[in-house]
């Protein structure tokens, strides 16, 4: 399976975008949104577990979130969000980065580890880890959309004098 097939975002990339960068952005976003329990489960299946060292231990901080009115208007500061970040280096010398919303140090650490592993072996870990996690996220998003759609109210306006 090629990267273009394994990571659907590659096909949407502009000509100026590096496909490897687009793939990495995609899997990093999937890892950041994944459930910690799913990442832990996959980590337990790796035998032997890869050796690594922390370049930056998991640490908690804040970031400003920006929004746009209507999704297209002028940007404005929406508010701050708690982030946890981590940087690891695998024995092969590959650096992995993990950024997650919230305060889960372990989630950021596992995200960084899997980022490093994906840089080395994306053909191995992409279908086994990234694709199932992405499908789970899509299913959760669809469920939330259906629940919200069930509460939607349609207002009709009546024309006077008809």
Predicted regions and their residues:
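Charge-rich, low-complexity N-terminal segments
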Residues: 1-47
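Generic alpha-helical scaffold signal
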Residues: 33, 82-84, 104-107
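A general structural signal for well-ordered secondary-structure junctions
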Residues: 36-37, 49-52, 123
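Structured beta-strand/loop patches that form or line metal/cofactor-binding pockets in enzymes
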Residues: 42-92, 97-98
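A hydrophobic, small-residue-rich beta->alpha segment in the mid-to-C-terminal subdomain
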Residues: 92-131
């Amino acid at each position: 399976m090629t990267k273009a097939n394994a990571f659907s975002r590659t096909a949407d990339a502009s000509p100026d975008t590096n496909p490897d960068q687009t793939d990495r952005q995609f899997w990093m976003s999937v890892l950041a949104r994944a459930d910690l329990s799913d990442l832990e489960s996959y980590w337990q299946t790796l035998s032997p577990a890869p050796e690594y060292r922390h370049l930056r231990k998991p640490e908690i901080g804040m970031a400003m979130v920006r929004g746009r009115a209507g999704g297209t208007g002028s940007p404005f500061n929406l508010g701050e969000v708690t982030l946890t970040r981590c940087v690891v280096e695998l024995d092969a010398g590959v650096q992995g980065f993990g950024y997650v919303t919230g305060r889960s140090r372990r989630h950021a650490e596992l995200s960084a580890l899997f980022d490093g592993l994906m840089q080395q072996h994306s053909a191995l870990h992409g279908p086994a880890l990234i694709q199932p996690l992405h499908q789970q996220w899509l299913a959760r998003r669809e469920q939330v959309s259906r629940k919200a759609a069930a509460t939607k109210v349609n207002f009709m306006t009546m024309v006077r004098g008809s």
